[in-house]
């Protein structure tokens, strides 16, 4: 049914637009800009912003709960120093992979220090 397909497409677009607006308001977007991990061109890319809001920022929230905002800043400074040209072209994927690898380490450290 064409109408169902069109409705679904519109819902997806609305959902993406909502994620983009949330990402624009997010303190993490500002931190990524300050660390030069996001460029002004990335800010114009809906797919990147929606991807960050959906897949990366919830993980930053987890890190923030464990280590505070400074913990997030330190993580971003660290991964900025490790960044290569490939990751600049796939920034959302790079940021997601980096935090996914880092969070278990932080959680393990917390368990060891209890």
Language-model region placement:
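Electrostatic interaction modules used in gene-expression and signaling proteins
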Residues: 1-114
């Amino acid at each position: 049914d064409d109408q169902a397909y069109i409705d679904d497409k519109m819902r997806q677009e609305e959902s993406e637009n909502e994620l983009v607006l949330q990402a624009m308001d997010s303190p993490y977007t500002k931190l990524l800009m300050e660390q030069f991990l996001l460029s002004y061109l990335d800010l114009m890319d809906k797919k990147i912003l929606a991807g960050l809001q959906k897949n990366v920022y919830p993980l930053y929230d987890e890190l923030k709960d464990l280590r505070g905002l400074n913990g997030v800043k330190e993580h971003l400074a660290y991964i900025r120093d490790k960044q290569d040209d490939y990751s600049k072209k796939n920034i959302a994927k790079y940021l997601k992979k980096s935090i996914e690898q880092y969070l278990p380490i932080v959680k393990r450290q917390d368990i060891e220090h209890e």
